[in-house]
Swiss-Prot record:
Gene that encodes the chain: trpF
Enzyme Commission no: 5.3.1.24
Keyword Plastid: no
Protein name per its UniProtKB record: N-(5'-phosphoribosyl)anthranilate isomerase
UniProt record, GO biological process: L-tryptophan biosynthetic process
Entries under HAMAP family matching the protein: PRAI (MF_00135)
Length: 202
C-alpha cells in the first residue's frame, strides 16, 4: 500500500516519515496551519530520497505558482484541492492528484473531468481544505464509479481505521495528516504506527 504523509514542516517529521517507509511526502502551500514556503520545502526536500515522491498541496493556484513550486522544491506531484480547471491537471511537468470533498456520501459530478489525475476523496472542508481529521461517509460511496489504481483515500484516517478503509476501497494509496498528530504537531510514533498498519494489510 502506498502511504502519503502530508503537512510536514520540520526535518524531524520528514525523517520519521521517510525512515518508516512513507512513499509520498506532502508539503502544503495553500493557506493552512501546516503551510510552508517553497524555500522551506526545498530545504526539507534535500533529505528525501529520490524514491519517495514529493507532493505539493495547492488550492486554486495560479499556473505561475504551480510552476515555481514544481521547479523550486522540486515536486514530483501536485495535489489540487480547489476548483481548478481540468486543463491545469493535464500537465507534463508533474503528476497530478485531484482532491474532491465527499458530501452526503455523493461523488462529485465532475470527477471524470480529470482522466489523467489520481483521484483523492476527502471529507468536506472546514476552515481550510483537507486536514480536518474527519472521515466522509464510506458506506454511501458507489465504488463502481471509482478506478482503484487511481484512487487515494483521505479524510480522518488513523492507525485504527486505515485497514478498514483499505479493505473497503482497495485504493492505490492512503493519505494522512491530522491522524498522525498530537496537539497539532506531527508525532513520530503515530507516523510509524500508521505506516506499519497501512502496509500490513493483505
Amino acid at each position: 500500500m502506498i502511504v502519503k504523509i502530508c503537512g510536514l514542516k520540520k526535518a524531524v517529521d520528514v525523517a520519521a516519515a521517510v525512515d518508516n517507509g512513507a512513499d509520498m511526502i506532502g508539503f502544503v502551500f495553500a493557506k493552512s496551519k501546516r503551510q510552508v514556503t517553497v524555500e522551506k520545502a526545498h530545504e526539507l526536500a534535500k533529505n528525501i530520497p529520490a524514491n519517495v515522491k514529493k507532493v505539493g498541496v495547492f488550492v486554486n493556484p495560479t499556473e505561475e505558482e504551480l510552476k515555481a513550486a514544481i521547479k523550486g522544491v522540486p515536486l514530483d506531484i501536485v495535489q489540487l484541492h480547489g476548483q481548478e480547471p481540468a486543463k491545469q491537471a493535464n500537465r507534463t511537468d508533474a503528476k497530478v492528484i485531484k482532491a474532491f470533498p465527499v458530501k452526503d456520501g455523493k461523488l462529485p459530478t465532475n470527477i471524470n473531468d480529470y482522466p489523467n489525475a489520481y483521484i483523492l476523496l476527502d471529507a468536506p472542508a472546514e476552515e481550510y481544505e483537507g486536514g480536518s481529521g474527519k472521515t466522509f461517509d464510506w458506506d454511501k460511496i458507489n465504488r463502481d464509479m471509482l478506478t482503484k489504481n487511481k484512487l487515494i483515500i483521505a479524510g480522518g484516517l488513523n492507525a485504527q481505521n486505515v485497514q478498514e478503509a483499505i479493505k473497503r476501497f482497495e485504493p492505490y494509496a492512503v493519505d494522512i495528516s491530522s491522524g498522525v498528530e498530537t496537539n497539532g504537531e506531527k508525532d513520530p510514533e503515530k507516523i510509524k504506527c500508521f505506516i506499519k498498519t497501512a502496509k500490513g494489510v493483505e
